[in-house]
């Protein structure tokens, strides 16, 4: 195709579509992190602000205006020969398929593609009389970096029969060559082997769209039940052939020759698969591989956008990596090429997606800097034929000039005179048309005048002079163009003057009549305002009688004038008198007509009076009804007062009960406030930790950006410069590793904060549901601990808890947005650093070997430390198992001792005949020498196997919490040495802040261990002989 460039380049238009929060996000307690500036296409997220061409959704423009503002100009450009592209970009689950309309559900009817199809065929219907159209469509997808045809019947049937468990996965047909991407000699990207279907109606095109949408690869993930697993491109090709008249005054010939102009334009409607993270989507196996390919293609697209959006790189002619993926290869014309492109960035406003939303907005902002070069695509064959035809016409004109012997100057003068004559002819034709348009008005006025005279006077007398005047007026229509004599002009002027006077007189009479009627109406209105029925009736009767009398007198005068006209002679004086009488007669007839109108108006006024009387009667009835209602209302007020007195008495009784419940709820409120305070402290601590990690990451990234490594000149020597260079390399490597660790730390804090926020949101949802059940008077569902705990709270406590949770959710949301912003910047800089090459600053093989040796030494040292930690962990696990075993044995011995003690108490009581309580005191006295009864504030023997609280597993025991001894700070040798020393006490102190056993509750103090456990192994050994000797002494 031959291209005709426009005068200026055009940039890529970018629109942002913000979808609302979905159900899962609301359940998780997600908050809106995207703010739209009122009245401006500007979006804010955290501390970042972006300006685009259009913003839809949220508080921006409604989504229904998206087609008219974004896609409609591109559809109009198709008929002018311009290529166009609409590109939907964004995170998975952000609404790209819904926006484009490539889904197979009913909701897709509101998308861009169905509206484009409707507008396309609507405009074709209006232009098909002048232009011949041919429409072709193709629908392809890029699935796992393979281009597959969605409109190929063989491929679709194969996918329907062989596909199981993977919705819409298109299978490759054996023996058919795969679709190849080709580039023509003029740089146009084409697909070899794809199916192009010719369509002529909207129904056929919609069927192709539905067929491809059903065959498209989709799958279910944790973020989207029907996630697109491929990039889809729906292409509409519009071919049109126009016939243009080549006749012009310059060639001097009007032979009716036509030229044919052939235009071909393409509209690419692209629905990209969304970027995704494996942890969020929960994909594995095939889904994970698909996600890898999707992210790979989107990464290549992002690199292309970054390269084209960087003005410095564009001016320097930097390489644009179109060939890194098949997606960017197919979109080569759409990004920086021959196309008018609109990019729709679909984003999610949820704070849990803040990182992906920020990345999408950054790429969309870069895309606005891309400059495309759209051109009109014409057929080169038709263009060449047009040039040849123009050349033939020029040669024929030259040949005629040479054979005729006329000079070029004379021909040019003749052409200019032809143009001037044509212009003059057009002016004359326009004036002629104006005069002809004025003639029907004159004829109409003359006809009305003739009709009046014919009805009144001219029926009996038709003077010859009047006939001559009429004939002269009728003949004055044509002299405007043809006649040039002075008589015709005079007749025309007289007719116009006569017409003007006639119109002026009629208008004066009408104005006078209007003024008179206005005065009468005003006087009647004044009378009607303070009317008396009898006086008004008398007034109207008198008016009607006056009108009848006046009508009768006018009729008599008219009859008299008609009689006089009939008796008059036909001479000149009689003719003048007849004209005067005719005018008087006409005035009288007008007066009669006016009187008739007055009579009708009086009748109407009488009718209105009757209506007003009826309205007065209705008003009186309504007044009586209102009075009756007033009596009933007073009776009801008395009843309501009595009922209120009874209700107030009952409420006072209830108030006493509520005060009792209020004291109970006050206690619950204090308890809930303590719980809220503890949760706030935990949330604040975690938020501060996340903020510190984010701050460290930001400082490291700024240090990397602002302090690049300075290379020394002498890197080959072994002097001071070489040592300095080696140390700088080591510092640089340590810094890079620290940056990666901090990024991992921030991401870990981000995920942990997300889990905390999800727990808070779940509790908030439960409290709101319980509150709704309470309002409706229903009982919450049973069997759920969350509902049971929430139901036990009072309404005021629930409201206070809900408010507290909402505040904590806002704090958590702000923290998530801040961390997402830092993670986005870290990933962006890391990606830019990776693209430039992490190891480009290594200038020699010696530097690389030194850095590799340093990395090897660091790795070996880290492995050794890791082995030592593993050994310590294993020893701690063994020690923990031993402690648990000893604890269980001690518990069994304690139970056996208690059982034996009870038996001996019963035996002593039976022998002595005393109550069991006194024997219990004797048994307690026998156990006093036990070292376990020593006050805990002074000393406490360390007995392996004795611990408080519930025994936890090894993983919980080894949790690196502040309440526990950090790993590596307590030597296992010291513990083993303590276990081997017999008889030596292990003293616990109140000021000791590190314990080998973690205590679950605050009231569990290690120095009160002797108060919880009353018996030990030594106590049992010492108490057994004394208990055995006691019965012997008694005997």
Curated annotation (Swiss-Prot):
SMART domains tied to this protein: KISc
Domain of life of the organism encoding this protein: Eukaryota
KW GTP-binding (keyword) present: no
PROSITE patterns: KINESIN_MOTOR_1, KINESIN_MOTOR_2
InterPro entries associated with the record: Kinesin-like_fam (IPR027640), Kinesin_motor_CS (IPR019821), Kinesin_motor_dom (IPR001752), Kinesin_motor_dom_sf (IPR036961), P-loop_NTPase (IPR027417)
UniProt keyword annotation of Repeat present: no
CDD domains: KISc_KIF4
Pfam families: Kinesin
Similarity-based family: Belongs to the TRAFAC class myosin-kinesin ATPase superfamily. Kinesin family. KIN-4 subfamily.
Domain comment (free text): Composed of an N-terminal domain which is responsible for the motor activity of kinesin (it hydrolyzes ATP and binds microtubule) and a central to C-terminal alpha-helical coiled coil domain that mediates the heavy chain dimerization.
Protein name: Kinesin-like protein KIN-4A
Gene from which the chain derives: KIN4A
């Amino acid at each position: 195709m031959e291209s005709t460039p426009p005068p200026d380049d055009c940039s890529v238009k970018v629109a942002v579509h913000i979808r609302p929060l979905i159900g899962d996000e609301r359940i998780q307690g997600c908050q809106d992190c995207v703010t739209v500036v009122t009245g401006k296409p500007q979006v804010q997220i955290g501390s970042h602000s972006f300006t685009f061409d259009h913003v839809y959704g949220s508080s921006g423009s409604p989504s229904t205006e998206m087609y008219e503002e974004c896609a409609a100009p591109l559809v109009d450009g198709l008929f002018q020969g311009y290529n166009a592209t609409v590109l939907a970009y964004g995170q998975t689950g952000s609404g790209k398929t819904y926006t484009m309309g490539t889904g197979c559900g009913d909701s897709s009817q509101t998308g861009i593609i169905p509206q484009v199809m409707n507008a396309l065929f609507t405009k074709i219907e209006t232009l098909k009389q002048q232009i011949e159209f041919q429409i072709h469509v193709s629908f392809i997808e890029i699935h796992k970096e393979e281009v597959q045809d969605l409109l190929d019947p063989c491929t679709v049937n194969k996918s329907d029969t062989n596909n199981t468990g993977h919705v819409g996965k298109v299978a490759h047909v054996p023996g058919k060559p795969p679709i190849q991407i080709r580039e023509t000699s003029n740089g146009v990207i084409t697909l070899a082997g794809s199916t192009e279907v010719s369509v002529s109606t909207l129904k056929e095109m919609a069927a192709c769209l539905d067929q491809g949408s059903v065959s498209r690869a989709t799958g279910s993930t944790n973020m989207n039940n029907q996630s697109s697993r491929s990039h889809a491109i729906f292409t509409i090709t519009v071919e049109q052939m126009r016939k243009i008249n080549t006749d012009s005054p310059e060639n001097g010939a009007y032979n009716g020759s036509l030229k044919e102009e052939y235009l071909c334009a393409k509209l690419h409607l692209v629905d990209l698969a969304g970027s995704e993270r494996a942890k969020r989507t929960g994909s594995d196996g095939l889904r994970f591989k698909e996600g890898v390919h999707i992210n790979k293609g989107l990464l290549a697209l992002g690199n292309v956008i970054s390269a084209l959006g960087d003005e410095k790189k564009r001016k320097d002619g930097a390489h644009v990596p179109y060939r890194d993926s098949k997606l960017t290869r197919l979109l080569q014309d759409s990004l920086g090429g021959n196309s008018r492109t609109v990019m729709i960035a679909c984003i999610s406003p949820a704070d849990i997606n803040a990182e992906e939303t920020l990345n999408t907005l950054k790429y969309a902002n870069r895309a606005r800097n891309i400059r495309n070069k759209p051109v009109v695509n014409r057929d080169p064959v038709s263009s060449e034929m047009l040039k040849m035809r123009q050349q033939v016409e020029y040669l024929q004109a030259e040949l005629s000039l040479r054979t005729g012997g006329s000079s070029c100057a004379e021909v040019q003068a003749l052409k200019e005179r032809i143009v001037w004559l044509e212009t003059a002819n057009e002016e004359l034709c326009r004036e002629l048309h104006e005069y002809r348009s004025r003639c029907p008005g004159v004829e109409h006025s003359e006809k009305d005048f003739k009709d009046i005279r014919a009805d009144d006077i001219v029926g009996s007398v038709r003077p010859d002079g009047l006939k001559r005047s009429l004939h002269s007026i009728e003949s004055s229509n044509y002299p405007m163009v043809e006649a040039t004599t002075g008589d015709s002009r005079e007749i025309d002027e007289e007719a116009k003057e006569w017409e003007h006077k006639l119109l002026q007189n009629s208008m004066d009479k009408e104005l006078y009549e209007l003024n008179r009627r206005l005065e009468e109406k005003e006087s009647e209105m004044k009378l009607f305002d303070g009317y008396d029925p009898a006086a008004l009736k008398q007034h109207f009767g008198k008016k009607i009688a006056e009108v009848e009398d006046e009508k009768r007198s006018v009729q008599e005068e008219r009859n008299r004038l008609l009689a006089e006209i009939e008796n008059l002679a036909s001479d000149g004086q009689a003719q003048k008198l007849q004209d005067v009488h005719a005018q008087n007669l006409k005035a009288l007839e007008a007066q009669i007509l006016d009187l008739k109108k007055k009579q009708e108006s009086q009748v109407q006024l009488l009718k209105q009076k009757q209506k007003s009387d009826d309205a007065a009667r209705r008003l009186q009835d309504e007044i009586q009804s209102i009075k009756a209602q007033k009596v009933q209302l007073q009776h009801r007020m008395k009843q309501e007062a009595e009922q209120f007195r009874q209700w107030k008495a009952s409420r006072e009784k209830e108030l006493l009960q509520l005060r009792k419940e209020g004291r109970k709820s006050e206690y619950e409120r204090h308890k809930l406030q303590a719980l809220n305070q503890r949760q706030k402290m935990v949330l604040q601590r975690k938020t501060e930790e996340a903020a510190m990690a984010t701050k460290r990451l930001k400082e490291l990234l700024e240090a990397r950006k602002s302090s690049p490594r300075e290379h020394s000149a002498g890197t080959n020597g072994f002097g001071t410069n070489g040592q300095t260079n080696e140390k700088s390399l080591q510092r640089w490597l340590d810094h890079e590793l620290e940056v990666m660790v901090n990024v991992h730390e921030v991401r870990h804090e981000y995920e942990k904060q997300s889990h905390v926020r999800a727990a808070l949101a779940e509790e908030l949802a439960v409290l709101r549901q319980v509150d709704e059940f309470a309002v409706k008077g229903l009982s919450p569902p049973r069997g759920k601990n969350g509902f049971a705990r929430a139901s036990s709270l009072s309404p005021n406590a629930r409201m206070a808890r809900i408010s507290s949770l909402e505040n904590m959710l806002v704090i958590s949301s702000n923290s998530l947005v801040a961390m997402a912003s830092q993670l986005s910047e870290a990933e962006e800089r890391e990606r830019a650093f990776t693209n430039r090459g992490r190891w480009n600053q290594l200038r020699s093989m010696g530097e690389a070997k030194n850095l590799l040796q340093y990395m090897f030494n660091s790795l070996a040292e880290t492995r050794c430390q890791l082995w030592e930690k593993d050994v310590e962990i294993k020893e701690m696990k063994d020690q923990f198992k031993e402690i648990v075993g000893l604890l269980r044995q001690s518990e069994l011995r304690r139970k056996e001792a208690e059982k034996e003690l009870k038996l001996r108490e019963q035996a002593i009581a039976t022998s002595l005949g005393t109550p069991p309580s006194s024997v219990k005191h004797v048994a307690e006295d026998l156990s006093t020498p036990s070292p376990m009864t020593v006050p805990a504030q002074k000393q406490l023997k360390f007995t392996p196997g004795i611990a408080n609280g519930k025994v936890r597993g090894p993983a919980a025991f080894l949790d690196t919490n502040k309440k526990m001894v950090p790993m590596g700070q307590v030597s296992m040798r010291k513990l083993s040495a303590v276990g081997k020393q017999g008889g030596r006490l292990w003293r616990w102190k109140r000021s000791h802040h590190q314990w080998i056993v973690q205590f679950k509750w605050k009231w569990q103090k290690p120095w009160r261990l002797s108060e919880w456990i009353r018996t030990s192994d030594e106590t049992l050994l010492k108490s057994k002989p004394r208990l055995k000797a006691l019965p012997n002494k008694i005997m």
